[in-house]
Amino acid sequence: MENGDNIMDVKEFWIDVLKQNREKLISYFHKDAVIRWHCSNELFTVSEYIKANCEYPGEWEGKIERIEKTENMIITAVKVYPVNKSSSFHVVSFIKTENNLITEMDEYWADDTEVPEWRQNMKIGSKIWI
């Protein structure tokens, strides 16, 4: 679970999140960790988070788009989508660690959508990715 920076391996963590690997996910968390999904106003214990993640319908893939690290915080921006690519989401995660275990995780999930019509009518901006 550690890498050369002596901090949790967040890439492996995201692989296990996307694979819904219940057995491995628990190893990333301190037993008293708290997880917050701010967009839906939910607070989870570790077991509740793992249940919500691992019992979410479908098979999932994703791509880590950005990782930032400080002494005890990892920030990730990840694009998540079902294997059939019928939809996609972005999640920004603020992962607080202690002794290489997650003690707190604050996540902000958003649906990927088209530009709203009112902004299209303004004819401003351009696509980040196509």
Q: What annotation goes with each model-predicted range?
A:
Residues M1-I130:
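C-terminal and inter-domain tail/linker signature
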